[in-house]
Amino acid sequence: MQNNKLKKIIILCLKIIAIEECLTFVVLHYFFEIKPFTISPIVIVSFLVLFILNYLTKNYQKKDYFKISHIPLVVILLFFVIHLRAGIIWALNTFPLNDANMVLLTLQEPFDDFAYLMVKQYLETTIPQTAVVSIILLLFVYVLLNSTKKRLAFIGMYFITTIVFVFIDIPVLNYIYILSNEPEKQSSYSKFFVENYVNPDSVKITLPEEKRNLILIYLESLETTFADKEHGGNQDSNLIPEITELAKENISFGKHESHIGGGLDASGSTSTFTTMHTRSLGIPHIVNYRNTPILHYYKSFYKILNENGYKQIFFQGNPGLYNQFRNFVIDQKVDEVYGPEDLIERLDLDVETLIKNQGYKTVQDKDAFKFATTILDTISEPFSLTFFTIDTHAPHGMYDPDCIKIENEKDADEQLKVTARCVSRELDKFLISLKSKTFYENTSIVIFGDHRFMGTRLVKDFPDRKWVNIFINVSKIPSVEEKRRFSDIDMFPTILSAMGFSIKGNKLGLGTDLFSEEKTLVEKMGLDSLNKEIDKISGHLVYESYLLKKNLKEK
């Protein structure tokens, strides 16, 4: 009798411990990204213990415990809910889903090679993960739960929990609001826009005595968080030492003591195209550029440079939204535009190698800098050259073993670390090479992180995330450089000012020249208040487009 009691107590204790370990695994899987084949041996042992106990106690003999006809239903539903959650985790680590307007605007664009790569990465990440977790949870529900009803109830609870966390992690109501209101059909007047937008044609813009050239470099996802803690970042070891030194030795707005400077992401400026649009026009990208006629009449710094005789070239080495970029810069009077196909041909790159290394035809940063050098060797002055890097793109960068080799090439965090390290190194090499060029002394170089990193690796929960800004070889000394708070809209007048242009009133678009003492809208209003006003601008731009169409018809 006592032996039976002791046996039951031992079985109960083992069962409780095993169930606790299994439930811990379920929770960890649910809230964190579980990588295939890296599951704790303790979890596997716990499942085996439950399986053995289930057999010894003959639970499997109970009525309705095991029906073969129910297995496909349980397997399919379980795989579906686990894949749904895995997909959400992947998307949150890859895209800025908190910016509903940007996501919906991006989805309006044609499906390109970069989008295919994202789909490929999504499937390669989520399918193996889902398969492994599904097998383990399938064993869990069959060992621990003794009927199909209970198993389906578990799956239902899993699904409901996922939907609840979708509403917590993603601003679903913002998506619903935007889709139901359709900005393209909603016309409204914005007092904020009218009072704060400065039309470049309405103010005096004076050229310097000698026109200065411009090299504008957008570094993919490069934020100050990649620096070490001493310099305002979040890393134990500095991933961008060369960029950090450049920021310290040159002008970097927002710097403070040993911390390098950075800009804030405001509404309508959280992806590569939206930031270029915003920094060029001083107007946030909150409505579709192609479908909003009035935006084509607003003047960017590219149009201003065009009016003053500048030769202007733009290129990007990756196909992501290339046609969108191309149409925008041509509309803004850029003379020559080159895409990945052009770079591949001119640099004589092997397409098969590119696809093998990165999954699609994209030109890595080291080759993009080479292409920039070839252009600068032949371009006539005065000129502006704008180009983008790509290697540090979310979710884990584009690892190049020829730059820095890591032991575990499947470690996503290490991939991103060495990728950031390589971009910093390649940028520095490029800038050093420019110093020997005849045009260098008369050329302002502006370096931006195009936006904050869209994933969570290395940056999660860091409160002070900002995109990098560096102004090199400029003709002015800023009145105030430290502790400045600014966003993308302020880059429109600041870029021109860095080239020696004088702007009466120190404002263009919605932006403020950071070389002046004037306060930016972020400094005046705060970022949250500014974002609320920016979100209302879409209706005003539709309103102005309506008036434009009406005036054109009357003419």
Predicted features and spans:
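Basic, amphipathic N-terminal segments that precede the first structured/catalytic domain
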Residues: T162-K191, I355-Q364, A368-F371
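Transmembrane and membrane-interface helices of multi-pass
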Residues: Q2-P183
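Solvent-exposed soluble domains appended to multi-pass membrane proteins
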Residues: P200-K555
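Generic detector of well-ordered alpha-helical segments enriched in charged/polar residues
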Residues: I89, Q108, K120, V132-V133, ...
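Short extracytoplasmic/periplasmic juxtamembrane "stem" segments immediately C-terminal to an N-terminal membrane anchor
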Residues: T106, E184-N199
